Design a protein with these regions (language model features):
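Short, charged, amphipathic alpha-helical segments
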Residues: 155-160
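Short coil turns that connect the paired helices of HEAT/ARM alpha-solenoid repeats
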Residues: 148-150
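Short pre-active-site segment immediately N-terminal to the catalytic Zn-binding motif
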Residues: 60-79, 91-98
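Auxiliary, metal-adjacent structural segments of Zn-dependent hydrolase domains
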Residues: 5-58
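Extended, helix-rich structural scaffolds rather than catalytic motifs
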Residues: 51, 111, 115-121, 125-134, ...
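Post-HExxH zinc-binding segment in Zn-dependent metallohydrolases
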Residues: 33-34, 55, 91-129
Length: 369
């Protein structure tokens, strides 16, 4: 658990229990119209079994290791899975049916959870088993590596080609109505309040990297902190790219600010958030111009991205009630304006290639300035 103090560890586990109960009550009200009676919720020591419903004791058990090792999104998926078992047993009273039979699967759909959520996930990077997605990932990685060329025009041409390849891949998926699976994952930290630069980063992923995004309620179990976190939805390939871009840009912001602060002789970090927002606004504008140039260069409308209705349906299925909020923006200080200029010079660098082609990220100090 990472806590050397048994008293602190016990207090943290009690906090986990309170959070699980709050989410149980929310799902029971939101999806099941308060059909369930409150069960006993406890933490367990199983490593492979993430959760369990015990009908005799009216008890749902969630693995401690699951909470420590996996995202809160996965923990809540397990909780809803066990609530589905509880519903089948206590409300439908389908005692003779197979535990994962038709009634159970229908309740899982009602609760928006994975029918197979209780066995330890071995996240087998799906692109390894999909030659098309693996080829796309590796080609994009190769093209981004060409973006390191000292010849500015060659570098930009390589990055443009990578963007076109991703666009062609996604347009072809939608136009051919190819079978494709969607997933969701969380990026960044759970926070009570997110600064403007994080909102710009989410907008960049949504508008240019073929994923749907949502600031969703979540919980950081290690810090006992409730707040919101960025959740992205898409195909495995697009999620891998979005995760890479998120990590790359977050890393670049810190490095650019460090250099800018030294150049300007700034003694504090007071302008740091404004500078970050400026960089990402500038990078957002650069990507918009690049996409416009790409659209103008094609002779047909075949490469115009109209969105993915299947992805939007998946997104709406998991989020039946979505609220949109407006933000107040950022005061245009000198640091913000300098950040915009720096953002227009940012270029994506190649990830460290893994089996999927998007394993980690590299940073080139000369490429962003």
């Amino acid at each position: 658990m990472g806590s050397a103090d048994p008293q602190n560890a016990a207090e943290l586990e009690r906090a986990w229990g309170r959070s699980l109960y709050r989410w149980w009550e929310f799902y029971n009200h939101e999806y099941l119209r308060d059909a369930l009676r409150r069960p006993l919720l406890q933490l367990g020591d199983a490593a492979q079994r993430l959760g369990e419903w015990d009908s005799a004791l009216r008890r749902i058990t969630i693995s401690r290791q699951h909470i420590c090792s996996d995202s809160w999104t996965d923990v809540l998926d397990t909780l809803r899975h066990e609530m589905a078992h509880q519903y089948v047993w206590e409300v439908l009273q389908a005692h003779a049916e197979d535990p994962h039979g038709e009634a159970f699967r229908l309740v899982c759909r009602k609760l928006r959870c994975d029918p197979a959520a209780t066995a330890r996930r071995v996240n087998p990077e799906r692109t390894e088993n999909d030659p098309v997605e693996l080829r796309i990932a590796r080609l994009v990685t190769k093209l981004l590596s060409l973006g390191d060329s000292p010849n500015e025009h060659e570098a930009q041409a390589a990055v443009n080609k990578a963007q076109r390849l991703l666009l062609e891949y996604n347009v072809d998926l939608v136009d051919s109505d190819a079978e494709r699976g969607f997933e969701r994952r969380q990026l960044g930290q759970v926070k009570g309040r997110h600064p403007a630069w994080e909102l710009w980063l989410a907008m960049i992923l949504n508008e240019f990297f073929f994923v749907e995004v949502l600031w969703t309620r979540s919980y950081d179990a290690a810090r006992d902190l409730e707040g919101t976190v960025l959740e992205v939805y898409g195909t495995v390939t697009n999620l891998a790219m979005a995760e890479y871009v998120h990590a790359f840009l977050s890393n670049v912001l810190e490095r650019l600010w460090s250099g800018y602060r030294q150049e300007q002789g700034l003694s504090s970090n007071r302008e740091r958030m404004r500078y970050f927002a400026g960089v990402l606004q500038g990078f957002h504008g650069k990507l918009g111009l690049q996409r416009a140039d790409l659209q103008a260069s094609v002779e047909t409308e075949a490469l115009v991205w109209q969105g993915d209705e299947r992805l939007q349906s998946y997104y709406r299925y998991h989020n039946p009630r979505i609220q949109t909020r407006q933000t107040g923006g950022v005061a245009a200080s000198e640091a913000f304006r300098h950040g915009v200029e720096a953002g227009r010079r940012v270029t994506l660098r190649p990830p460290i290639e893994s089996a999927t082609g998007f394993g980690g990220y590299l940073y080139s100090g000369s490429g962003e300035r």
